[in-house]
Structures are given as C-alpha cells and as structure tokens.
Amino acid sequence: MMGAPIPSAAPVGAATPGKGLLLSIVVPVFNEAEVLDLFLARLEPALEKARAALGPGGRSEIVFVDDGSVDGTAERIAGLIRPGAGVRLVKLSRNFGKDAALAAGLAHASGDAVVPMDADLQDPPELLERMVAAWRDG
C-alpha cells in the first residue's frame, strides 16, 4: 500500500538485552594485502572511539569479504581471526565484483548498524565516531 509507513526492525539505539550496541564494519577486499596494515592501523583507534559513541557496552565487528584475491589477502586476514577479536572472513570462490562482495558482507553482518568501508582508505575510518553519533541521534 502506497504511503504506508515502513516498520523498523528495531528502534535506533535498541541493543540486544544484556549487551551494548554492535557496529559492523563490512570491508570488501580484492588483492589488498599491501594496504591491510595501514588500514588496520587507522581503523583500530577509530573503532575504539566509535564503540564509545555507541554507549555503554558498545561493541564492534569487522566482516572482511575476500573477493577472490590472489595476493595473500585472505591468508593475511585469516591470521587476524581469533576468539573475541571481532574479525570475520567471508571468502568468495572467485572474483564476483565489489557489489557482490558487499552484498555478501551485509548478509553476514550482525550489527545494529552496518558501515561499508574500503580497505584502500577511500573512506576515512576517522569518520566512524561522527557517523555513529549521527545514527544515535536519529
């Protein structure tokens, strides 16, 4: 029906009972092994601030989607995965393109809010805190 309001899955700021809000960063990657260290060096402090902006118990996860890399990108990311690290890897069987990789990442993200981000730093991680604050403000 046209003009009918679209129901929201959950109001902004609604956390899982007993846990704080979860921010998912979805990062499609293709042959990004050379930039991963720089990306993570900038992302980690930005995520710390973004988690604080989420409010008490704010949490984050990074969902990398390897789009058929042949330069060791997936192996490098796999080395970051450990219990409690908040890093996940979705590995596509071949290069399907950025749109497909992003869609796969969105499907695997668990966050109350999801931010797509490129590993080549086209999207400055330092903006995450402001983005989260704007989202929280509605």
Model-derived segments and spans:
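Structured catalytic core of nucleotide-sugar glycosyltransferases
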Residues: 2-138
